[in-house]
């Protein structure tokens, strides 16, 4: 039995009655032990122990509340947190810096930024932990500009300050800003000591690198870890696996996974299984799952099965998907989450089993959410099932009235069947409601710099050269037999205008830039925010053969690995 567990075991009414003379020191230890052993079954909450302490007329000291306040960490706990704050004021402990920082963290965790700001403003001398707490509070709340303003006002900063803001940028989806801030952290600053990133900083930066496909920057972070002999534990190892896989370097991800050796746990296995699923390597997924559950005797968790079911989706393996879904429940006692149900609906839809998908949704023990209806909409769109599309869209709009993707999907179904009046009506409805279509966007990294391209982009410094290169590429493709797949243009245009519209998709601009800027034979890695269209998919296959380039494209669904004229997805995506 651990020391903390032993303390909790004795924290009972008999113990208290027999020891009426307990000092605050021992009460504080009991409170801290309960808070730190949240996963253990307990007969007493921290607040009940505090109240019992007060019943014995023992006064709290400046250690009591920093131990007690972390037990209030979500909006439901706010009333208790406020009453505890009143106790702090009653005993005159509100000026203590440790108590003040704990109050800031409590209000932040409970989502009460106004009270957190008030505690900060009322502080006479604001120490570094208080500054860090308030910056973290705004960053976690998504108010990243306010967090940055406070960060810039700080009289001094440490690794926690930088890490809080970098993590805030990542949480807000501002990955380039996160990497820019990390680079700023490395620069020498007048009158400020050099701040070395810690494990949390590096795992956060690796996440940003993965999102942007910034492989070179991710490799630099890995080299930094090795240079300073930072131990690659499960958290950092999993972050490296995820980064390398998302950047299109699966072999490096595998090397990190294998290097973990005996440290591999369910998190590491789940990360690797999810990575293999993104690449459509279903057989390797199944093999690794078997190794995990038999050779290493590690039980899978819900994340593991999200990866396994995702692998089934990418290959359209309906029987295997149903088998693993059943195994999850019956063999491992895991209650399916909405993500698991979403995978199954997606699997049924991609397999053309729309009626089965609808029956499966009807059998769910929870209300279907945006993920479920979106999966049904996507599957029925692939089959041109307009009636099911319309029904799914109606449910989606009820749950998320501003979901542009739903409108666009239905509009695309109408466009493919030539129902231009319905397309016009949907676009008019989007305009009236102020719903904007998410533009196609692609990222590439060249010489350590991430470049962003949007459809029809002319903002690049070398736009003229990029478009000239793209024209040259398309001419070579046409000479090799390429014919534009104009059915992918879901606009009421003539054939010539459709060809022009297709030629300026963001991934085509990105590949032209890479062919212009990199040496022959250099692999090309592109991150796309939307699903790659059929015409761009065909273009990538042909470029990989004609220009002898390995091309890796990560779209919103999966990875496409183009080599010598073929794709790893086998044209199923």
From Swiss-Prot:
GO molecular function: RNA binding; zinc ion binding
Keywords for this protein: Repeat
Domain of life according to the entry: Eukaryota
PPR repeats: 23-60, 61-95, 96-126, 127-161, 162-188, 198-232, 233-263, 265-295, 301-336, 337-367
Location of region: Type DYW motif: 479-573
Family assignment from sequence similarity: Belongs to the PPR family. PCMP-H subfamily.
Tagged with keyword Repeat: yes
Region of interest (Type E(+) motif), ranges: 448-478
Biological processes, Gene Ontology terms: RNA modification
The protein's name: Pentatricopeptide repeat-containing protein At3g62890
Pfam families in alphabetical order: DYW_deaminase, E_motif, PPR, PPR_1, PPR_2
Residue ranges, annotated region (Type E motif): 372-447
């Amino acid at each position: 039995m651990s020391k903390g567990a032993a303390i909790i075991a004795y924290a009972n009414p008999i113990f208290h009655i027999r020891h009426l003379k307990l000092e605050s020191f021992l009460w504080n230890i009991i409170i801290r032990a309960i808070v730190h052993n949240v996963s253990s079954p307990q007969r007493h909450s921290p607040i009940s122990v505090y109240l019992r302490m007060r019943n014995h007329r023992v006064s709290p000291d400046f250690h009591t509340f920093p131990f007690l306040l972390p037990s209030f960490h979500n909006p439901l706990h706010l009333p208790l947190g406020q009453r505890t704050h009143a106790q702090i004021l009653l005993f005159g402990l509100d000026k203590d810096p440790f108590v003040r920082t704990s109050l800031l963290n409590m209000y932040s965790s409970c989502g009460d930024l106004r009270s957190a700001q008030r505690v900060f403003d009322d502080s006479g001398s604001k120490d570094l932990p208080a500054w860090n707490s308030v910056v973290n509070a705004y960053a976690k709340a998504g108010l990243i500009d306010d967090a940055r303003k406070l960060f810039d006002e700080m009289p001094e900063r440490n690794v926690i300050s930088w890490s809080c803001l970098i993590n805030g940028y990542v949480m807000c989806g501002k990955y380039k800003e996160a990497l820019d801030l990390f680079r700023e952290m490395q620069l020498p600053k007048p009158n400020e000591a050099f701040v070395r990133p810690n494990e949390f900083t590096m795992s956060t930066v690796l996440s940003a690198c993965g999102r942007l496909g910034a492989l070179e920057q991710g490799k630099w972070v890995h080299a930094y870890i090795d240079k300073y002999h930072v131990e690659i534990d499960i958290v950092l190892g999993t972050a490296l696996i995820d980064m390398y896989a998302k950047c299109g370097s699966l072999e490096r991800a595998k090397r990190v996974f294998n290097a973990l050796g005996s440290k591999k746990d369910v998190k590491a296995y789940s990360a690797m299984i999810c990575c293999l699923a993104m690449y459509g390597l279903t057989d390797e997924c199944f093999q690794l799952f078997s190794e995990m559950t038999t050779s290493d005797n590690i039980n899978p968790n819900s994340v593991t099965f999200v990866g396994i079911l995702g692998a089934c989706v990418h290959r359209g393996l309906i029987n295997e998907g149903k088998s693993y879904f059943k195994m999850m429940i019956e063999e491992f006692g895991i209650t399916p989450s909405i993500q698991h149900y979403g995978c199954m609906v997606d699997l049924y839809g991609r397999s053309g089993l729309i009626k089965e998908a609808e029956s499966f949704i009807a059998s769910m023990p929870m209300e279907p959410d945006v993920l479920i209806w979106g999966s049904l909409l996507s599957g029925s769109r692939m089959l041109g099932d307009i009636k099911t599309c319309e029904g799914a869209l109606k449910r989606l709009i009820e749950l998320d009235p501003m979901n542009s993707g739903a409108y666009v999907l239905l509009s695309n179904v109408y466009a493919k069947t030539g129902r231009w009046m319905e397309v016009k009506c949907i676009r008019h409805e989007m305009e009236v409601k102020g719903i904007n279509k998410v533009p196609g966007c692609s990222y590439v990294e060249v010489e350590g710099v991430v470049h962003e391209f949007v459809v029809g982009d002319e903002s690049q410094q070398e736009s003229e050269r990029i478009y000239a290169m793209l024209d040259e590429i398309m001419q070579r493709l046409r000479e090799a037999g390429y014919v534009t797949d104009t059915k992918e243009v879901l606009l009421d245009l003539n054939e010539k205008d459709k060809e022009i519209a297709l030629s300026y998709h963001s991934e085509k601009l990105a590949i032209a830039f890479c062919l212009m800027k990199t040496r022959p034979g250099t692999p090309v890695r592109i991150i796309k925010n939307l699903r790659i269209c059929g015409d761009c998919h065909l273009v990538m296959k042909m470029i990989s053969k004609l220009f002898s380039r390995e091309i890796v494209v990560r779209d919103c669904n999966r990875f496409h690995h183009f080599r010598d004229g073929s794709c790893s997805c086998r044209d199923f995506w």
